[in-house]
Amino acid sequence: MKYPRDLLGYGQNSPKVVWPKRAKIAVQFVINYEEGGENCLLHGDSASESFLSEIVGAEPWPGKRHFNMESIYDYGARSGFWRLHRLFTAESIPVTIFGVATALAKSPVQVNAMQLAQWEIASHGLKWIEYKNFSKKKERSFLQKAIKVHTAATGLAPKGWYLGRGTENTVALASETGSFEYISDSYDDDLPYWITSKNAPQLIIPYTLDANDMRFATQQGFNSWSQFFDYLKGTFDVLYKEGVEGSPKMMNIGLHCRLSGRPGRLMALKEFIKYTKSFKDVWYAKRIDIAEHWKKYHPPCEKKINPYQMTKGQFIGTFGNIFEHSPWIAEKAYSRGLNPSMKSPEATHGFLCFEFRMASDKEKLKVLKSHPDLALDNKKLVEKLTTSSTLEQKGAGLTSLSDRQQKEFNQLNHQYKEKFKHPFIIAVKGKTRSQILRQFKIRYENSRADEFMTACREVEKIAYFRLKELF
């Protein structure tokens, strides 16, 4: 069983990003060109469009044209697009178009204007519709048609992909084509990242639904240009400061011709562009520029081990002895569900410890009893040690004791086990013999309950050290 969501991402280990000219932030504007590709009886759909318009809360009209809705979308193509085009060309700011293929096919003049401005035209799918109920086969068919129609409408195959209203299969289907330099059906980070796909590593450049004018057309959204400006400014300020502090990020801004192309909303963009241009070291980029930069300076790297990609046998074989002679812990972790977050010793340790902590005290005691005595002098028992235990004890100097030292350890082991009913357990890595002996004597004074908890914590520490060796 696998849980496909990666809830860790880069975590505390963000890559050291150096944008071109050492910019503190990459600012990326997307204009979604959807007009003419939305739900409409004229397009062969069963109902009218209801999404992202001035009519907040609109419902589809089955079997009927919604003339007002069509007219609102028409505004985006007829007027809104050109207003945005004038703004960005005048400011010399590059743009990525997310172009719905059937919309582009109906707008050759607008497409020509995009190309003359040297904007990137990425694919936004075949139609601007809801895909949530599509079968994998049908979605693949629409994807292939989107590429074909896009190529015919623009003269070039798209290098980027963003469907928007997709399914759990969208990213995999787009990736398996091998056609896209990046995919943007993701909202989970402020930086690009690589994923494992069927054919080769796939670059993901996350998009945004917060710094997005769509919130003018949703409940609890923006209702004035100043609100949109304030939100964009706040986002920019935080990310720019992070860049100054040494951790540059990417700021996505999502726009729609029929929304931001309205005069009252364009003011937000004008003021925001003016504001950002008052700062040094801002990189205005197309998404394809970011993709090419990332591919060059942050290429995919092969992981030493990748737990998420392991079979059950591989996972248990690799992690079965992380908790001494207790492969059931790894088995339970696998059964609960591997996930992509298991990319570091810290993450994998957390998932394995969860299973150990969920166990009953009786099960935990079995794990404690699976650990060897320290400084074993019984050859037969020594031969039963796991490789990890042998190396750990050797590293602490417990395999080369004098007769006097051996006698002292034997006596302490015997007394401790008589009192607590399990071996003395301590993560010996980095500790000297004298430190271990001191802890032996201190912990002997604990109550059984306190020592049981202490021993369990030491088991977890040992597990972490073992995992670090693997990663």
Predicted regions and their residues:
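C-terminal amphipathic alpha-helical segment
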Residues: D210-N212, A217-F228
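Aromatic-anchored, charged helix-turn/loop surface patch used as a conserved interaction hotspot
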Residues: Q309, E331-L412, I462-F471
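A non-catalytic, amphipathic alpha-helix used as a structural packing/dimerization or gating element
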Residues: R83, S141, K145, Y231-V238, ...
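C-terminal non-catalytic interaction appendages of large macromolecular assemblies
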Residues: Q405-F471
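Catalytic alpha-helical scaffold of carbohydrate-active enzymes acting on polysaccharides/glycoconjugates
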Residues: K2-L203, F229-I253, L259-E302
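A structural motif
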Residues: S197-F216
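Residue-level signal for inorganic ion chemistry
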Residues: S326-P327, F424
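Charged, compositionally biased N-terminal leader segments and the immediate start
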Residues: K303-N321
